[in-house]
Amino acid sequence: MMTFPAGPMRLACLLLAWIVAGNVAAAAPAACKGTIYLTFDTGSQSQATLIADTLRRHHAKATFFLANEKTVNGDFSLDPSWAPYWKALVAEGHAFGTHTFDHVYAQRDLPDGKIEMKPQFGAQAGKKVAWTGQQVCDELNRVATRFHALTGATLDPLWRAPGGKLTPQLRAAGAACGYAHVGWAPAGFSGDELPSQTWSNAKLLQQSLAGLKDGDIVMAHLGIWSRKDPWAPAVLDPLLSGLEQKGFCFATLRDHPDYRQHIAEQRR
């Protein structure tokens, strides 16, 4: 038990103790009123650095879904030139899933059990191909292999279909090789790929702040070729600040109740 001397010195000590205790209490973080799960898909990569810097400034963790996409630099997002970027995000504690290596869009399930797919990049870009479940797994695992080669880290057993286009057979194929599919909440659609002429950044920000709730998964991109007024420079920082003011915290999908057990089981 702490004791204080008598007289004026005692009063001074008590005052000092009160000030210190008050400062400690003020410095203690407020309890989270809910958690938002930020996710980013690869894209043109035009906003990749800005997004990483903004997350770092807010001490916010996110989950990134990776495909080998053409970037504004003329390279591809899983080329060795992007290794420092991905390594830095790994070191900061973010999570990572596969978005198919060639950014492959699902078309439809076929009667023979195969899935009709259409790669955006790679040797079969623009062509419709019929894949078996194993070929789907191979495509998902290409990202895991490249990610490990670039960073030395292991990809999380999560994936997201490009465009969110998912068929029953495609979902089953991903699950068969250990990947859980991740979509996003209705309010979590950032709108960063919508035309800025009709969907202004101010409108998208207001919509997100009004609609997001505890447990929601947010989906945005590291850059969109078609949007004239980029989303991230105008929206991301005020979005995170606004959510923080509402008492929300941010976490990766490793902590999401729908995925944490799956991830733990796949890690065993």
Model-predicted regions and their roles:
Residues 28-31, 62, 228-268:
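C-terminal domain-boundary segment and adjacent tail
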Residues 40-43, 65-69, 99-103, 161-164, ...:
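Active-site-proximal beta-strand/loop segments in catalytic clefts of secreted hydrolases
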Residues 12-23:
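Bacterial N-terminal signal peptides
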Residues 27-131, 139-157, 231:
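Active-site beta->alpha N-cap acidic-glycine motif
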Residues 165-211, 248-259:
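His/Asp/Glu-enriched short active-site or ligand-binding loop at hydrolase and phosphoryl-transfer sites
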Residues 108-115, 193-198, 228-234, 262-266:
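Histidine/acidic-residue-rich catalytic or RNA/ligand-binding cores of hydrolases
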Residues 1-13:
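Bacterial N-terminal signal peptides that target proteins for export
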